[in-house]
C-alpha cells in the first residue's frame, strides 16, 4: 500500500512541534513524508484557531484539496485521506464534517496519538468519518514514540500545554485545556534525543511555558528555571530558548537565570497585548503596564544586551485613542526589538466576542501606525550590530542560490553567501555584520572562525 504523508501546519510553534510528532508517529507505521500534496495518500492540516483568518485559511485549503481529489480520480488514483488536526478541530468538532464532508478524520491537539488506529479503521472500510477530541492529561506524551526521527539544528520540545489564565480574547484554554507540565526526566530525554541527532539549540515551548511545574523522579515540583538548568547539562546543546511566557509567571528565579546561565540566549518573547491598564483589565491579563515594564527593566539590569519581543493586539473592544496611545508609548519605552502585532479578532465562546466591537477601519488604522513604529524600532535594534562580530547558528538555506541563513543569540536572521566548500549548516560561527534591514542582518564569516 502506498503510504505517503503530507502535512501543512498553521499557527504557533506548539503546532510545529505537534506536526513533527505526527510525522514521527506515522513514520513508525510505514508512512513517508512528501513535499507535494498531490503525491500524498494522507493529508493532514494541523490547524490554528487563534484568529478568524486562521480557521478560514483551513477551509480554503480544503476547497483546493477537493479539486486535487477530483484530479486524482481522473488519473485513476484513489482519493487521499483528509485529516483536520489541531485547535480548529478541537473547537469546531463535527461541524467540520457538516461544512466539509470530504474530511475523514478530526483530532484535537491532545488526541492525535490515536491516528494510527483511526487510519486503520478507515482502511478497513468500516468507517468514513472519525473524530477524537479527548482531553486526557499526559496521554499524548506517554503514547507517542520517544525517539524523534527528524534531526534538526534547532529543535522544538513541548514542556507545558494548556493555559489557566483565561484572557478574554483567547481560545487556548478551550482548545488546549488546563495547564499541564511534562515530567522533568521525560523532557530531558527528549532534548537528549534531538541533541544526539544533531540539534545545537533547543526551544522549550508551551502555551504558558513560564508556568512549567513538572515533577522530578522523586515527585518534587520543578520550575522552568530548574528545567533549563537541567537541560543545560547536555553538552551538545549550546543554546536554550523558551516561548511563550506570561508576565505573571516571570519569577525572580527565572529572571536571574538570564544573567547566570550562559546557554540561555539573551532573547525573550513576553507578550504584553496592550499598554493600557484599562484594556489589560478588560483582557483579564492580571498584570499592569507598570509591572510589565518593571520586568523588562529587571531583565535589562541582569542582562543588558537582551532583546525583548512581544505580542500586541489593537482594536480590542473598549480601546479608545488614549488607550492606543498608551500602547504606542509602552512599545517605545520597552524598546521592543521584535514584536508581532494584530487586529483584535472575535473568537466564538470568548468573553470579548460579545462586547461592542471597534470598526475594522479604526483597527486597521491603528495597526498601521503601530507597525510603522515597530518597524523602525526593529531596524534600530538590528543596526546596532553593524560592524560587530556575533556567533551565528546556521540552520536553513536562503532564497538565493548559495545563500545560507542563521540566527544570532538575539533571534535575528543573518544572511551570508556560503562558499560551496564551506559547509556551515548546523555550525555556530562568528560573523561580522556588514548591513541590516528591519527583518534581516547581512554579513560575512570571520576568517578562522
Curated annotation (Swiss-Prot):
Binding site for [4Fe-4S] cluster 2: 163, 167, 170
Domain TRAM residues, every copy: 383-447
Domain of life, per lineage: Bacteria
EC top class, as a word: transferase
Gene3D superfamilies xrefs: Methylthiotransferase, N-terminal domain, tm_1862 like domain
CDD domains given in the database record: Radical_SAM
Name of a matching Pfam family: TRAM
Family matches, as InterPro entries: Elp3/MiaA/NifB-like_rSAM, Methylthiotransferase, Methylthiotransferase_CS, Methylthiotransferase_N, Methylthiotransferase_N_sf, MiaB_methiolase, rSAM, rSAM_horseshoe
Limits of the Radical SAM core domain: 149-380
Family membership: Belongs to the methylthiotransferase family. MiaB subfamily.
Function: Catalyzes the methylthiolation of N6-(dimethylallyl)adenosine (i(6)A), leading to the formation of 2-methylthio-N6-(dimethylallyl)adenosine (ms(2)i(6)A) at position 37 in tRNAs that read codons beginning with uridine.
Subunit structure, interactors included: Monomer.
Protein name per the record: tRNA-2-methylthio-N(6)-dimethylallyladenosine synthase
Organism expressing this protein natively: Orientia tsutsugamushi (strain Boryong) (Rickettsia tsutsugamushi)
Gene encoding the protein: miaB
Amino acid at each position: 500500500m502506498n503510504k505517503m504523508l503530507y502535512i501543512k501546519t498553521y499557527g504557533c510553534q506548539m503546532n510545529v512541534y505537534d506536526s513533527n510528532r505526527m510525522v514521527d508517529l506515522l513514520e513508525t507505521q510505514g508512512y513517508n513524508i512528501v513535499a507535494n500534496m498531490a503525491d500524498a495518500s494522507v493529508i493532514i492540516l494541523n490547524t490554528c484557531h487563534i484568529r478568524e483568518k486562521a480557521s478560514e485559511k483551513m477551509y480554503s485549503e480544503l476547497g483546493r484539496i477537493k479539486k486535487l481529489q477530483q484530479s486524482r480520480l481522473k488519473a485513476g488514483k484513489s482519493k487521499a485521506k483528509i485529516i483536520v488536526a489541531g485547535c480548529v478541530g478541537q473547537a469546531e468538532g463535527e461541524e467540520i464534517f457538516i461544512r466539509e464532508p470530504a474530511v475523514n478524520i478530526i483530532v484535537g491537539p491532545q488526541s492525535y496519538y490515536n491516528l494510527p488506529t483511526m487510519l486503520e479503521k478507515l482502511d478497513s472500510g468500516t468507517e468514513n468519518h472519525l473524530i477524537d477530541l479527548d482531553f486526557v492529561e499526559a496521554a499524548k506524551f506517554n503514547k507517542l514514540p520517544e525517539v524523534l526521527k527528524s534531526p534538526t539544528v534547532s529543535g522544538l520540545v513541548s514542556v507545558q500545554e494548556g493555559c489557566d489564565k483565561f484572557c478574554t480574547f483567547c481560545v487556548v484554554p478551550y482548545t488546549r485545556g488546563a495547564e499541564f507540565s511534562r515530567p522533568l526526566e521525560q523532557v530531558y530525554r527528549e532534548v537528549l534525543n534531538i541533541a544526539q541527532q544533531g540539534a545545537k539549540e533547543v526551544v522549550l515551548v508551551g502555551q504558558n511555558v513560564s508556568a512549567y511545574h513538572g515533577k522530578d523522579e522523586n515527585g518534587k515540583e520543578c520550575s522552568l528555571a530548574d528545567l533549563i538548568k537541567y537541560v543545560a547539562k547536555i553538552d551538545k546543546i549550546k543554546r536554550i530558548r523558551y516561548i511563550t511566557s506570561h508576565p505573571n509567571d516571570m519569577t525572580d528565579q527565572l529572571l536571574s537565570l538570564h544573567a547566570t546561565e550562559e546557554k540561555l540566549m539573551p532573547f525573550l518573547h513576553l507578550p504584553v497585548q496592550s499598554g493600557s491598564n484599562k484594556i489589560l483589565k478588560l483582557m483579564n491579563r492580571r498584570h499592569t503596564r507598570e509591572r510589565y515594564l518593571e520586568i523588562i527593566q529587571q531583565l535589562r539590569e541582569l542582562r543588558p544586551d537582551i532583546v525583548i519581543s512581544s505580542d500586541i493586539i489593537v482594536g480590542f473592544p473598549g480601546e479608545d485613542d488614549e488607550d492606543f496611545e498608551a500602547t504606542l508609548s509602552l512599545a517605545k519605552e520597552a524598546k521592543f526589538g521584535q514584536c508581532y502585532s494584530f487586529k483584535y479578532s472575535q473568537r466564538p465562546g470568548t468573553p470579548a466576542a460579545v462586547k461592542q466591537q471597534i470598526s475594522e477601519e479604526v483597527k486597521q488604522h491603528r495597526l498601521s501606525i503601530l507597525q510603522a513604529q515597530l518597524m523602525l524600532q526593529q531596524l534600530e535594534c538590528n543596526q546596532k550590530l553593524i560592524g560587530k562580530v556575533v556567533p551565528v547558528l546556521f540552520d536553513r538555506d536562503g532564497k538565493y542560490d548559495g545563500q545560507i541563513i542563521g540566527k544570532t543569540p538575539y533571534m535575528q536572521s543573518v544572511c551570508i553567501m556560503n562558499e560551496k566548500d564551506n559547509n556551515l549548516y548546523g555550525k555556530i560561527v562568528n560573523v561580522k555584520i556588514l548591513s541590516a534591514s528591519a527583518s534581516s542582518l547581512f554579513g560575512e564569516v570571520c576568517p578562522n572562525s
